[in-house]
Swiss-Prot record:
Entry's Gene Ontology cellular component terms: cytosol
Domain tr-type G: start-end pairs: 10-204
Protein name per the record: Elongation factor Tu
Catalyzed chemical reaction(s): GTP + H2O = GDP + phosphate + H(+)
Region (G4) location: 136-139
KW Metal-binding (keyword) present: yes
Function: GTP hydrolase that promotes the GTP-dependent binding of aminoacyl-tRNA to the A-site of ribosomes during protein biosynthesis.
InterPro entries given in the database record: EF-Tu_GTP-bd (IPR041709), EF-Tu_GTPase (IPR050055), EFTu-like_2 (IPR004161), EFTU_2 (IPR033720), G_TR_CS (IPR031157), P-loop_NTPase (IPR027417), Small_GTP-bd (IPR005225), T_Tr_GTP-bd_dom (IPR000795)
Region span, G2: 60-64
CDD domains: EF_Tu, EFTU_II, EFTU_III
Region (G3): 81-84
């Protein structure tokens, strides 16, 4: 089977299905690929091809995820679907599958259920920016008033977690009927695709964001000065531009006097490239791994934040025992470990392996961070959890 050429002409958008177990997420995923392939070209994926998802590792955590792709006339979508609730929790927290928007599937026969709420909350915590609702199994509900009631409940739930519930697109459909080729319900899948195109804005590309490079190594080159190396996470750095060195110590300023890659001198380094950046007037000992180079004013160092974390189960190589308040692990951000203390939510005494939990973390050194930054929780170099900065506090 030859690999299809990756079409670079269309904007690329990452989405995924979320929602309560058995509300039809995987059936909808199959229906979208099938109906869009039939309408706009591309390849359909059967339910059972999606449901037996392969395992992947993200930050040392095993997650079952299915990836499908589909096209509308204006965009190319990469779509993730997870078989189990725990896989969603892990996926969203580790950022293994970053979503530019999510399709929340709610069965009209049940209305919102506990995992519906949990996935909306997780979406808020981990920074999923847009949610579109697919009200599924509408072929099984004859009562218009009941559908309106369920719709109202979903809108209220979204609003509770700071999503714009009143303005959220809601499509009433039947994934199964659409998959079976019923034209009336296929039209609802096309309607859903239309909302994906219009409601989720085109994501900003990494290269268009402000420059950031996590420092991996520092060298001093006699006669030339200090070079830091790392992979440019976002943006572009040009020779002659000012940069800030942020994190761990007080923020310092410098100027980039050279960029090199594979021993060749360049005039700029771009997102995704591994580069060496030569800095003016900085001594080797003034800079260290774990700091970042950044566009001045674009990122600040912080020590305290609210986070959403997933603690690995024993089977995943995590802890065998719970931990309590006063737990002091290392938090691994980008390229370095920093010790931190935790505060658990009111009424939570201990955290078991396999749990996901909200916690406030205070680090002993500041780290350059924004909301949405991912981290690992480690004990002596072994990963015991994964987390995301939900809200910077100080």
């Amino acid at each position: 089977m030859s690999k299809e050429k990756f079409e670079r002409t269309k904007p690329h958008v990452n989405v995924g299905t979320i929602g309560h177990v058995d509300h039809g997420k995987t059936t909808l995923t199959a229906a979208i690929t099938t109906v869009l392939a039939k309408t706009y070209g591309g390849s359909a994926r059967a339910f059972d091809q999606i449901d037996n998802a392969p395992e992947e590792k993200a930050r040392g955590i095993t997650i079952n995820t299915s990836h499908v792709e589909y096209d509308t006339p204006t965009r190319h979508y990469a779509h993730v679907d997870c078989p189990g609730h725990a896989d969603y929790v892990k996926n969203m927290i580790t950022g293994a599958a970053q979503m530019d928007g999510a399709i929340l599937v709610v069965a009209a026969t049940d209305g919102p259920m506990p995992q519906t709420r949990e996935h909306i909350l997780l979406g808020r915590q981990v920074g999923v920016p847009y949610i579109i609702v697919f009200l599924n199994k509408c072929d099984m509900v004859d009562d218009e008033e009941l559908l309106e009631l369920v719709e109202m409940e979903v809108r209220e739930l979204l609003s509770q977690y700071d999503f714009p519930g009143d303005d959220t697109p809601i499509v009433r459909g039947s994934a199964l009927k659409a998959l079976e080729g019923d034209a009336e319900w296929e039209a609802k899948i096309i309607e859903l695709a239309g909302h994906l195109d219009s409601y989720i804005p085109e994501p900003e590309r990494a290269i268009d964001k402000p420059f950031l490079l996590p420092i991996e190594d520092v060298f001093s080159i006699s006669g030339r000065g200090t070079v830091v190396t790392g992979r440019v996470e976002r943006g572009i750095i040009k020779v002659g531009e000012e940069v800030e060195i942020v994190g761990i110590k007080d923020t310092a300023k410098s100027t980039c006097t050279g960029v090199e890659m594979f021993r060749k001198l360049l005039d700029e380094g771009r997102a995704g490239e591994n580069v060496g950046v030569l800095l003016r007037g900085i001594k080797r000992e003034e800079i260290e791994r774990g700091q970042v180079l950044a566009k001045p004013g674009s990122i600040k160092p912080h020590t305290k934040f609210e986070s959403e974390v997933y603690i690995l189960s024993k089977d995943e190589g995590g802890r065998h025992t719970p931990f309590f308040k006063g737990y002091r692990p290392q938090f691994y951000f980008r390229t370095t470990d920093v010790t931190g203390t935790i505060e658990l939510p009111e009424g939570v005494e201990m955290v078991m392996p396999g749990d996901n939990i909200k916690m406030v973390v205070t680090l002993i050194h500041p780290i350059a961070m924004d909301d949405g930054l991912r981290f690992a929780i480690r004990e002596g170099g072994r990963t015991v959890g994964a987390g995301v900065v939900a809200k910077v506090l100080g």
